[in-house]
């Protein structure tokens, strides 16, 4: 059975043409991207590395990592976002290899081929996130690093990520997130360890609605990122 939620894919298909509009529904992704790329680059040293970006969408993270000198492959199951990614690539001149394939299928094709694997803001949109994490472990080289991000599951996360972001501040379209699919750090850590990935670091991402700025912080109550590593 394919680990794909077609309703989730359809949400992003409908919005794909606005992916690179920095004032669109994707503004939060553009705003947090420099923070995420810096955090990953500081830990993995992207220059010269072979990187796989799972759930790449329209290519915001993929292009940014390629600009740091990485050899990036971006995969997604959304046809429209990938078309937008390829089109933007022609405009930007940034080289990324985009493919429409699942993480699990990619792991069958190219096990142990990547120095770094990223899977950001994607796990909460698939039926079986643990399956994706197992695929990440298979895809990364021994000693390589896997970076994951998602949203915590607690009342504060519901208030901020759903009610606040989708209804009050309208940073995201209503229905973008399903609170039931949010993932606690303890769950993400357990799935990572079960897959053979050691958790090395965790950092939160917070938003100030007054200044409209994001920053990295030790607060992992809502958005957070995790650095894991496969044994050498």
UniProtKB/Swiss-Prot annotation:
EC number: 2.1.1.222, 2.1.1.64
Family statement drawn from the similarity comment of this UniProt entry: Belongs to the methyltransferase superfamily. UbiG/COQ3 family.
Catalyzed reactions per annotation: a 3-demethylubiquinol + S-adenosyl-L-methionine = a ubiquinol + S-adenosyl-L-homocysteine + H(+); a 3-(all-trans-polyprenyl)benzene-1,2-diol + S-adenosyl-L-methionine = a 2-methoxy-6-(all-trans-polyprenyl)phenol + S-adenosyl-L-homocysteine + H(+)
BP term (GO), one: methylation
Native source species: Pseudomonas aeruginosa (strain UCBPP-PA14)
Protein name: Ubiquinone biosynthesis O-methyltransferase
Binding-site residues, S-adenosyl-L-methionine: 36, 55, 76, 120
InterPro entries (UniProt xref): SAM-dependent_MTases_sf (IPR029063), UbiG_MeTrfase (IPR010233)
Protein function: O-methyltransferase that catalyzes the 2 O-methylation steps in the ubiquinone biosynthetic pathway.
Gene3D superfamilies, A to Z: Vaccinia Virus protein VP39 (3.40.50.150)
Pathway assigned to this chain's UniProt record: Cofactor biosynthesis; ubiquinone biosynthesis
Name of the gene: ubiG
SUPFAM superfamilies: S-adenosyl-L-methionine-dependent methyltransferases (SSF53335)
Keyword list, A-Z: Methyltransferase, S-adenosyl-L-methionine, Transferase, Ubiquinone biosynthesis
Enzyme class: transferase
One Gene Ontology MF term: 2-polyprenyl-6-hydroxyphenol methylase activity
């Amino acid at each position: 059975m394919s680990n794909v939620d077609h309703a989730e894919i359809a949400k992003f298909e409908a919005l794909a043409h606005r992916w690179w509009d920095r004032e669109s529904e994707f503004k939060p992704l553009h705003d947090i991207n420099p923070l995420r790329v810096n955090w990953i680059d500081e830990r993995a040293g992207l220059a010269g590395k072979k990187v796989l970006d799972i759930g790449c969408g329209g290519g915001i993270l993929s292009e940014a990592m390629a600009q740091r000198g990485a050899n990036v492959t971006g995969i997604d199951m959304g046809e429209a976002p990938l078309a937008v990614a390829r089109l933007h690539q022609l405009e930007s001149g940034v080289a990324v290899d985009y493919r429409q394939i699942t993480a699990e299928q990619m792991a069958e094709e190219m096990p142990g081929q990547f120095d770094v694997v990223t899977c950001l803001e994607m796990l909460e949109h698939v039926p079986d996130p643990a399956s994706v994490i197992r695929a990440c472990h298979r895809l990364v080289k021994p000693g390589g690093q896997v970076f994951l991000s998602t949203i915590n599951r607690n009342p504060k996360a519901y208030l901020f990520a759903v009610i606040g972001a989708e209804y009050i501040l309208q940073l995201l379209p209503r229905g973008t997130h399903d609170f039931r699919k949010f993932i606690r750090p303890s769950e993400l850590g357990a799935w990572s360890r079960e897959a053979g990935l050691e958790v090395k670091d965790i950092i939160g991402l917070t938003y100030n609605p007054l200044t409209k700025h994001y920053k990295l912080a030790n607060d992992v109550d809502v958005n957070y990122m995790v650095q894991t590593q496969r044994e050498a």
